[in-house]
Amino acid sequence: PGTVRALALAHERYGKLPWATLFEPAITLAEQGFVISPRLATLLAKDPYLAGDPDARAYFYQADGTPKTAGTRLTNPALARVLRTLASDGPDAFYRGPLAEAMVAKVHAHPTNPGVLSAADLASYQAKLRDGLCFDYRQSEICGFPTPSSGTIALGQIFGMLESRDMAALKPVQGEQGQLAASSEAIHLYSEAARLAFADRNQYVADVVDVPVTGLLDKGYLAQRGHLIGNRSMGVAQP
């Protein structure tokens, strides 16, 4: 639910086009629709949850409960109406009034997992500007989202653990069909570094805790973690 506020803040500070103009492509797509791809059709046939939601079932499935097939055109006039409201009335229309009331009602009415979202939660929501989180990797500085996001910390740890490795030597190899594919050694090194990074992420990173960002991205600490990567899978990594 924070996306609209975030986009509105970005538009206020950096936007060049009128707010309403930005919605036109999405409105057109919602009204004219798109064709279900073979991949989406396969996913719909396997998904165990969508059919349990009345709105999703009406959108993705036939009246008899079978999923709509590849080649079927899906349109979403309800989404188009929402987007037209936001385009004309601005971001506040998402956080107060009929749209907000409908979202709260939907969350509370879920048959198996009702939530506690309130009208006050939506009405009081504000987008926050945060300083980016940056780390060094060889000659580059890489920046991304800070906490409470966890992605940049994980990337910083992975890069840090692999910094001493000659990754440039592990160039992609030619596959059987002529396509380039990552070498097995490169995949192994990345997978093990990611395994360690996510073990730390699960232990130390959450929304409402004091995350030890400096320690997690410390070069010496990451060098120690990197030494745990051997020639075979470590199995379950420990934080």
What are these regions (language model features)?
Residues 1-14, 151-188:
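Gly/Pro-rich active-site capping loops and adjacent beta-alpha segments
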Residues 26, 83, 158, 193-197:
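Short alpha-helical scaffolding segments that buttress acidic/His motifs in well-ordered protein cores
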Residues 38, 116-119, 152, 211, ...:
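Low-complexity, intrinsically disordered regions enriched in charged/polar residues
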Residues 146, 154-156, 209:
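Short conserved micro-motifs at the rims of enzyme active sites and ligand-binding pockets
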Residues 1-96, 100-150, 167, 227-232:
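Noncatalytic scaffold domains of N-terminal-nucleophile
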Residues 167-239:
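Internal maturation/activation junctions in enzymes
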